[in-house]
From Swiss-Prot:
This is Glutamine--fructose-6-phosphate aminotransferase [isomerizing]. The keyword Transferase applies. It is found in: Cytoplasm. Catalyzes the first step in hexosamine metabolism, converting fructose-6P into glucosamine-6P using glutamine as a nitrogen source. It comes from Synechocystis sp. (strain ATCC 27184 / PCC 6803 / Kazusa). The lineage of its organism: Bacteria, Bacillati, Cyanobacteriota, Cyanophyceae, Synechococcales. Keywords: Aminotransferase, Cytoplasm, Glutamine amidotransferase, Repeat, Transferase. One of its GO terms (cellular component) is cytosol. The active site is at residues 2, 626. Homodimer. It catalyses: D-fructose 6-phosphate + L-glutamine = D-glucosamine 6-phosphate + L-glutamate.
Amino acid sequence: MCGIVGYIGTQTAVNILIEGLERLEYRGYDSAGIATVTEGKIESVRAKGKLFNLKEKLENHSNFSRLGIGHTRWATHGKPEEHNAHPHLDNQQRIAVVQNGIIENYQTLRDQLKEKGYQFYSETDTEVIPILIADILKDLPSDDPDEALLEAIGKAVHQLEGAFAIAVLDAHCPEQLIVARQQAPLILGFGQGEFFCASDVTALVHHTTTVLSLENGEIARLTPLGVEVYDFNLKRVRKLPRTLDWSATTVEKQGFRHFMLKEIYEQPAVVRTCLATYLNEQWRAADHPSHSPVFLGLDPQLTKNLQHIQVLACGTSWHAGLVGKYLLEQLAGIPTTVHYASEFRYAAPPLTPHTLTIGVTQSGETADTLAALEMEKQRRLTLEDDYKPLILGITNRPESTLATMVNEIINTHAGIEIGVAATKTFVAQVLAFYFLALDIAFQRHSLSLEAIEHIMVGLRQLPAQIETILEQQGSAIEALAHEFAETQDFIFLGRGINFPIALEGALKLKEISYIHAEGYPAGEMKHGPIALLDAKVPVVAIAMPGSVHDKVISNAQEAKARDARLIGVTPMDDSQARSVFDDLLLVPHVEEMLSPIVAVIPLQLLSYHIAARRGLDVDQPRNLAKSVTVE
């Protein structure tokens, strides 16, 4: 949610700021703005709506400043209007601030500053920050404006409560950009005589792959000569940048109409990368190996003597966690519960001993998930060893906040995902649960070596099977999608390990097509949802081979008896399904335990093509953000 970009260097700042904000559009926003320092003054331009509106306004401005900050805003405090857009300035137009996050005590600060005579012109929490900094500055020595600004920001951040990342300009400091982070992501980029800041590395990769992630409670001063990092008490902190393994092409469409479609087609490569990274190619059951077939690199103490696993996640990551529950229980034999992170904090279950807590978030910055993990850690810290916090993160961003607060992480290696609707990162998260379940199963001897090898063989076949779906079904699914462009409601059904896939299919459709869609366990249809069915409500049923196949077919026939149009996700060789379903989303024949990854692919394609047919913004659906960094 929201996006920050900052620049100081030798190039025209406006161009870099706009380009960076365009790279952050996928995070979701409803207004945008920039501020630069020119001849001792702050120049600020803001606009409601898309960046196109801001760019139109900038066409009438000649601005060659080499220092600036930019922001895309997702409304939290105050409506999405121009006067609420960032940057916000103090009353003297000296200080400009952009901010991500929420200042929880903004009303108290606002009231205090109003009593001092300051005026407020927006409804946002952010506006208190530049006014607070300016208020502190007036009482500091003015002989060195650069040092005074740093000191004022150091004092100001101690008064701010909540999660925030800020970037600050001072009209009196044309060679300095100061940023601060507390519970909201902020990345610094290093170039040749130029430096950048952004809320996500996607804004930086076209300019540099040398980056540094600020941690909570840190301030950074960027000048044309370099970067200095301090803690909130203004003590210097020594930090070293790292090099990203991403290239500029990873944030381009490369010939695809939308990023989402590109990312769907990247899934075979993502699965191959995960398999090559984590599965031991040489492992054979016949060799009676003494080592795990999976290279996760986890501390053995993390999974030793486990009695319970709890998964905390939101949205699509929660669906991946539900698949993980089946795998961890069926393969590793460990009771597993899956919680919405946003609910866990307010109704946490009783503490159980020898419990592994897994936080799943593709960005590593999902506020609800991080807060739930932190709460779980804190309530276990002072307890005896049996209850000590054992926390694992599953994320696509190993440099994220999540990685700093857990014992270990599993990197899903999916690469940058620009489309708001998760596709390849979901598949990568599910794979992470396969690897974890197999690793624990080997350690606990809950599966025979032969059974483990059988699953590994199936996993290695997945990339080619996904390619088969994309190559053989892509055009057919696109044609089918055209028939549902005016549909108002969908029902998705699944059982067992594919019930979460029904939920995921429904979520994908509603996210990007704005069609009301719900996922249900197939056996629950008769307990309420069947009342919704008629000829106008298509039903998508996931009927994969295995223990629940016949039950799903039976449930589908109940829907057909109510005139619903039936769409089946089913193997190419399933003659029974062909006789029941009106339309088929065909997939290769796979083992039931491996079916979620192949079953989800046609549902992604169906959702994409319906949304595209409706002429919608597939990559940036309304009201949604890629990374939800506020609670």
